[in-house]
Design a protein with these regions (language model features):
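N-terminal, polar/Ser/Thr-rich
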Residues: 1-45, 123-129, 149, 463-464
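Aromatic/His-enriched, Gly/Pro-containing loop or helix-boundary segments
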Residues: 60, 79-97, 133, 137-140, ...
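Hydrophobic alpha-helical and helix-loop surface patches within well-folded domains
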Residues: 199, 227-233, 237-504, 628, ...
């Protein structure tokens, strides 16, 4: 039988044959505690009963299961030989009846990669914590099932757990009895006490959004109440969970505040009451994603619990994620895409709704600025990679699906929806959503199902819009052309639209064009605006004819559409001198984003972008934009600056960051942001001595509190430059002997400038699977230091020798982390590009998902080399 990589064709064939009525899943996780035998993987018992129908009696199919062993299989009362029907990933089901009952008793393995049932041991107190993460297809690591989104069914879960644990799942649960019985699974000899938790049956949901969380979690509770216009009353129990070690940092009251604001907002706009009973939110350790929308039991990465001082941008990001996952309760959980081709039907909508509700319901009213500056940057990058794809993608199999949780599916899709709202109007858009929920509740949909309701509510032909925006790839560029008359006023203003040769689609854009002039006090302010439809290669904006000559023309003012903004020569010259004078924060964010795209496209030298950041970032009021500028400036220096200018640019960034740090308001979030940026830029002896002094208390900057998280941020550059050794890092871990502290220490250890250190880090990640997913991530992050290019050079050939083996032997999550994280991007030379091309030519038969990752990394490298050539040319001309 085929392996574990389920194809779309297989899924469609199975969905045409089977209908699932119910699941009953019984898990025994008492083996999670106690000593590990060390003999094979630690396992737990999983017993699954599936009741399903087959519309072709006598036909054959299969169930999915990834497990070390299967104890028993029964189909319609017939005992099957597991060795004959189970191949490690599938259970063969032959001679099916019209109505069927399948019972599978298996030994499933706990995970250390964040896929399936993840087991985490807290180094602080030795407590064990479990949680599940499945998307797109890892529930089969925990129980036997039909692992595809369109075979929905109600689920009943029962979990046996250690006596002092609490267990949560999608439905409301209760502990019904204590048990003391033999543990049949590996590592569970003898008898062990426990408790049995049973959970209410769920509504029909897909396998990938079922969930179990178990352990001695700290829990805070609250409730949400809503009385609707017809008098009906809805009460939703709320819960918020984290590890006991994080309880002292857990601001559950703010989590609940945003949760209630979101529930109010979505009830106001969706006209469909929250359908899944309770609403728990668990912040869990070693999580691969930002969060996951399991109905009734949302899981988040625990880094959203802040151990030290952070800026408001961090609180805004957390609120956005809370609302994003909440939007999924309707877009994704209530109504689910039929197959991963239409992943956008949940992720694009949730991404859009996250910002839409953030601005409409919470204190974060500038959420669209963050969207324009941060989310769209992700989309623009993804849409220019060789792996770009339409928002509605061609997903052949599960490996394709895993990689398509990308900037196209999330941020471009959300940007397209923002354009759709401008195109059809907000009222028509929301009424379409309401009809969509009511028409397809607990079902599965395709693109056409959504377009149908939008055509009904807007009266517009959605087919042409969908073809341009959802079924083609690539990003358009919009550039203003200004012709002035003899009187100095605008005679004609046009918008020129361009597309890449590989994706030539010129789309219809609803845009606002803003005209800006400098005032007598130096402010750069908008004095005219026109909203228009751009179509084809050139569109005249007749509404602006006769306006005063502008200093700046901003195409896509207010960020209505998805495009790369370009500037005419006058506008670009104005920004070079007066960017800090732009008074509107959204306009300023859009200009910064456009300048960054120019840098990435080798149209603006990296040194010019760095210079703009040094000159104007200190005047940036939006903290999220400021932190994004810091990240872009670092990336410009590391990847796009000419090698011969890097040292000069690095000194300039460090000096500028330190000057801004000293000038920032004491105790302000801007001071904190500049402190962190200074640490990333520090390399000179005096800078490193200052960081050391801030750590040991011999130096002080008024108002700057060097808390534990900031201490680790200062230690990484000290470790990377050989100032903080293993002894220093061990002492810091003793000071912060927590799971978070361990991750920081591992990253800093791998950052040290030693050949032996790099060899050890490589062995731990590439040649061993002993590290958990979180420590793999931390090791990779420390390994690749921009100041250590020569030290890392020997790993270029080793990378290409290893990646196919890693992809074959390790889980897809770890494979992705290694292939992306260890690509020799810092060996930015034509020779590395040639080595990449040689690998691709010699491995045409490699897994498509693996080739996609290498092609993406190759494209980033080629783009960096073009940027370096542009920057070098600027340096030559300046000289």
């Amino acid at each position: 039988m085929p392996g574990e990589n389920l194809s779309r064709d297989e899924a469609r064939e199975r969905a045409a044959l089977l209908s699932v009525d119910a699941y009953e899943v019984s898990l025994d996780v008492r083996s999670a505690v106690g000593e590990d035998t060390g003999d094979g993987p630690r396992t737990f018992r999983s017993v699954t009963t599936i009741r399903f129908r087959c519309n072709e009696p006598g036909a054959s199919s299969f169930a999915d299961l990834l497990a070390p062993s299967v104890t028993a299989v029964s189909l319609n009362g017939r005992d099957l030989d597991p060795s004959e029907v189970f191949d490690g990933s599938r259970i063969l089901l032959e001679d099916l009846a019209a109505d069927n009952e399948l019972v599978v008793d298996a030994q499933c393995a706990y995970s250390r990669t964040g896929e399936g049932l993840h087991r985490f041991v807290d180094p602080e107190d030795g407590e064990v914590y479990l949680y599940t993460q499945y998307e797109p297809a890892d529930s089969r690591r925990v129980f036997a099932n039909f692992e595809q989104p369109d075979l929905k069914a109600p689920f009943r879960f029962e979990v046996r757990a250690p006596e002092d644990w609490t267990v949560w799942s999608n439905g409301v649960g209760e502990r019904i009895e204590k048990v003391r019985e033999a543990l049949p699974q590996k590592g569970g000899g003898g008898r062990r006490a426990g408790g049995v938790w049973r959970f209410a049956e769920t509504k029909p949901i897909s396998t990938y959004i079922t969930c179990v969380v178990a352990g001695p979690y700290h829990q805070v509770t609250d409730s949400y109440e809503r009385v609707f216009e017809d008098g009906t009353r809805l009460e939703i129990p709320l819960g918020a969970l984290c590890r006991k070690g994080l309880a002292k940092h857990f601001d559950a009251e703010d989590v609940f505040l945003v949760t209630k604001q979101g529930l109010d907002f979505f009830h106001d706009h969706f006209d469909y009451p929250y359908p899944f009973g309770k609403y728990d939110q668990a912040f869990v350790p070693e999580y691969n994603l930002g969060a996951m929308e399991n109905p009734g039991m949302v899981t988040f990465r625990e880094e959203y619990i802040f151990r030290g001082k952070v800026t408001q941008a961090s609180y805004e990001a957390r609120a956005n994620v809370i609302l994003h996952e909440m939007a999924h309760m309707w877009f994704g959980d209530l109504v689910t895409m039929e197959w991963w081709d239409d992943l956008w039907l949940k992720e694009s909508f949730a991404d859009f709704m996250g910002s839409f509700s953030l601005v409409g319901a919470t204190r974060f009213t500038d959420g669209w600025i963050t969207f324009a500056n941060r989310r769209k940057a992700w989309a623009y990058r993804a849409d220019q990679l060789p792996s770009t794809h339409p928002v509605t993608a061609d997903i052949r199999d599960l490996q394709d699906a895993k990689l398509n949780f990308d900037g196209i599916t999330y941020a471009k899709g959300a940007s397209v929806l923002k354009q759709l709202v401008a195109y059809v109007g907000q009222d028509a858009f929301l009424e379409g959503a309401r009809r969509y929920f009511k028409r397809h509740a607990y079902g599965n949909t395709r693109l056409g199902d959504l377009l149908a309701v939008l055509e009904e509510t807007s009266g517009r032909d959605m087919g042409a819009w969908a073809r341009s925006w959802l079924q083609t790839a690539g990003v358009n560029s919009l550039t203003p052309q200004v012709v002035l008359g003899a009187d100095g006023r605008i005679e004609e203003l046009a918008v020129v639209q361009e597309a890449a040769e590989s994706y030539p689609e010129l789309r219809p854009h609803r845009v606002a064009v803003g005209l800006y002039q400098r005032s007598q006090v130096g402010a750069l302010e908008r004095y005219a605006r026109a909203e228009t439809d751009v179509a084809g290669a050139r569109t005249v904006v007749s509404e602006l004819a006769g306006a005063d000559a502008p200093d700046l023309v901003l195409v896509n003012d207010d960020d209505l559409t998805y495009c790369k903004i370009r500037f005419d020569e006058t506008s670009l010259a104005t920004l070079r001198e007066h960017l800090g004078g732009l008074t509107d924060p959204l306009a300023r964010a859009l200009c910064w984003s456009a300048l960054w795209n120019l840098t990435r496209d080798a149209l603006l030298p990296a040194r010019d972008f760095v210079g703009l950041v040094l000159r104007f970032a200190g005047r940036e009021s939006d903290i999220g934009v400021l932190q994004m500028l810091h990240a872009w400036a670092e990336s410009a220096l590391v990847h796009y600056a000419a090698p011969q200018w890097r040292e000069t640019g690095g000194r300039a960034l460090a000096e500028g960051a330190l000057a801004e740090l000293r000038q920032a308001e004491p105790g302000s979030e801007h001071q904190l942001a500049w402190a962190r940026f200074f640490a990333t830029a520090a390399s000179a002896p005096d800078d490193l001595e200052l960081l050391k002094g801030l750590l040991d208390g011999t130096e002080e900057i008024a108002g700057l509190e060097v808390d534990q998280e900031l201490r680790w941020a200062f230690l990484e550059p000290l470790a990377a430059h050989g100032v903080a050794d293993e002894k220093v890092l061990a002492a810091e871990l003793a000071r912060d002997d927590t799971a978070s502290g361990k991750r920081h220490q591992v990253r800093c250890l791998a950052a040290r400038p030693s050949a032996a250190v790099k060899a050890g880090a490589w062995e731990q990640v590439v040649d061993s699977d002993a590290l958990s997913n979180a420590l793999v991530e931390a090791t990779i992050a420390g390994f690749g230091q921009a100041s250590q290019r020569e030290l890392l050079a020997p790993y270029t050939p080793r990378y290409f020798e290893a990646i196919e083996r890693v992809w074959t032997e390790r889980s897809i999550q770890i494979g992705m982390d290694v292939v992306r994280g260890l690509f020799p991007a810092l060996q930015d030379s034509p020779e590395t590009l040639e080595a990449t091309d040689a690998w691709l030519a010699a491995h045409e038969g490699a897994a498509p998902a693996l080739r996609r990752l290498v092609l993406e990394a190759r494209d980033d490298l080629a783009r960096a080399l073009r940027g370096q050539a542009c920057d070098a040319a600027a340096g030559t001309s300046a000289g």
